[in-house]
Design a protein with these regions (language model features):
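Intrinsically disordered, low-complexity Ser/Thr- and Pro-rich stretches
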Residues: 2-3, 54
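Bacterial N-terminal signal peptides that target proteins for export
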Residues: 3-13
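Signals and flexible motifs at protein termini associated with secretion
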Residues: 4, 22-26
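Bacterial N-terminal signal peptides
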Residues: 12-22
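Feature captures hydrophobic
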Residues: 27-175
Length: 175
């Protein structure tokens, strides 16, 4: 075999590896505004969220017509918060907005703020453990209607799994 014949497969492998790395480098930072918009889209593709939260959960909106979930990576700081807005539409709990924080005043009886370290979000997104364990051991901190959250543990777990379904760069903090 000639040197040229041996070098072609190596060159092809190097190009393929470079393409994979370039794709990973283009992922938006986990919990950035752009990542949250993609998480909103993924919410709407997840029946356990759209259907199972369409009754009592979504109706508890404080009369404003939507619920807010703000989230951030603790190690990136509270200033990196993003927002999901969930609205009742056509009998479903649909994410109608994902991006930068727009709701300044939250209602703690209706809305949620959740934060965890990047490592913990990644673990929850992989399904290493669910919301009960995450909250019991302080791996997920949240403010909001705790009793309501306890009543929707199945959908809550699916929400945490969104973190693993939406590609995000965990090495960079959102700007």
């Amino acid at each position: 075999m000639t040197d040229d014949a041996m070098n072609k497969p190596i060159a092809c492998l190097a190009l393929a590896a470079a393409a994979l790395l370039a794709g990973a480098a283009r992922a938006e930072p986990l919990m950035s505004d752009a990542w949250t918009a993609k998480a909103c889209e993924q919410w709407n593709k997840t029946p356990i969220l759209t259907d199972d939260l369409a009754d009592k959960w979504i109706k508890n909106d404080g009369g404003k017509g939507f619920k807010v979930i703000q989230l951030y990576r603790t190690d990136c700081g509270e200033a990196s918060r993003t927002e999901l807005r969930v609205t009742r539409k056509d009998g479903k709990a649909l994410c109608s907005y994902g991006g930068k924080v727009e709701t300044v005043k939250l209602d703690s009886g209706v809305d949620y703020v959740m934060h965890a370290s990047t490592a913990r979000w990644t673990e929850m997104g992989r399904g290493d453990y669910g919301p009960m364990r995450a909250m019991m051991f302080g791996r997920l901190e949240f403010v909001g209607p705790k009793m309501e959250a306890m009543g929707v543990m199945g959908p809550f777990e699916s929400f945490l799994l969104l973190v693993g379904k939406v590609e995000g760069d965990t090495t960079a903090c959102p700007k």
